[in-house]
Structure formats: structure tokens, C-alpha cells
Regions:
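Conserved GNAT-fold acetyl-CoA-binding loop/helix
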Residues: 24-54
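A short helix-loop-beta-strand connector motif used in the catalytic cores of GNAT acetyltransferases and
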Residues: 54-65, 85, 90
Length: 159
């Protein structure tokens, strides 16, 4: 955390958000997801250590972590895959802890994912966001995401 002068006799504290790609699932990562996932979804339980390990080892997905003061405060999953017309990417499961919102973690996570996708040949990056997530939707639009005229369909395989 740094304090910087931004006007005559005015200072503000600047918080440094660090973004890293998760390569090892340890207790800290498991505990972070136990805290984060309920803030993202009321209907899905947090992933187990084994499920997180499968995610981290998958060649099709990259798990980004946001850290504030050395503590995991957010995550984003980037899924990348090839289709006949090129490499595509999807941003999924973006969540920032309530206590860390407003410090740029969401934007930093998304920018890291966009940079990674571009560096790895993706030609588009898509995401979905519920309309009720107003702050997230404003962020995505501010970052340059465009709302698409498209129908999104889901087929439930459970049961």
C-alpha cells in the first residue's frame, strides 16, 4: 500500500493488486474458494481440493488469482479452445471478495486474462454476466466488452 500526493495537500492510499496464475493448489487456495464461491453462486458449493487441482492442471483452463496484501481476494477462470475458425476464449467465474471490491481487483483479473488470451492466439474473448451484477457489467463495458445480440442457450445434463 502506497500513499501518493494527488493534489495540493491531498493524499490517497493506493492499493497494489497482484495477479498470478495458480499453479499449485494449497490450503490457502482451497480456503479462498470456500470464501469466494458463496459470493458468486448460492446454488453451487465451493470446489474441492481435487476439483481445483483438475482445473489447475487442465490445458484448456487457466486460473487467475488476485491478491491484496498477500491474501487471495479474487479469482477468474479463462477457458481457451480451438474451433474451425480460430482460438476462442471464455472468461468464467469472476469473483472478488466483498471486502476487496473497489480496489481494481476485478479489472486487473480481466486485463490479465485478456492479455493472456491474446498472447495465446485467441481472436475473441466472451463472458456472461447477470444483469443484476450492475458494477460488473459497468466494468466490462468500460473495459471494451460489447453487449452481443445473441441468444444464450443452456442444456441441463443433470438428472
Amino acid at each position: 500500500m502506497d500513499t501518493v500526493l494527488y493534489g495540493k495537500n491531498k493524499w490517497r492510499t493506493v492499493v497494489s493488486i497482484e495477479i498470478e496464475i495458480c499453479e499449485v493448489v494449497d490450503d490457502e487456495v482451497v480456503q479462498a474458494f470456500e470464501m469466494l464461491i458463496p459470493q458468486l453462486s448460492k446454488s453451487n458449493p465451493p470446489p474441492s481440493r481435487t476439483e481445483l487441482e483438475v482445473l489447475v492442471k487442465s490445458e484448456a483452463s487457466t486460473l487467475f488469482l488476485a491478491k491484496l496484501g498477500g491474501r487471495i481476494v479474487g479469482s477468474l477462470t479463462l477457458a481457451m479452445f480451438r474451433i474451425p475458425t480460430g482460438v476462442r476464449a471464455w472468461i468464467e467465474a469472476v469473483v472478488v471478495d466483498d471486502s476487496a471490491r473497489g480496489h481494481g481487483a476485478g479489472e486487473s483479473l480481466n486485463q490479465a486474462a485478456l492479455d493472456f488470451a491474446k498472447a495465446n492466439g485467441a481472436i475473441t474473448v466472451d463472458l456472461t454476466s447477470r444483469p443484476s451484477r450492475e458494477a460488473a457489467n459497468r466494468l466490462y463495458q468500460r473495459m471494451g466488452f460489447k453487449l452481443r445480440e445473441s441468444n444464450l442457450y443452456r442444456y441441463e445434463l443433470k438428472g
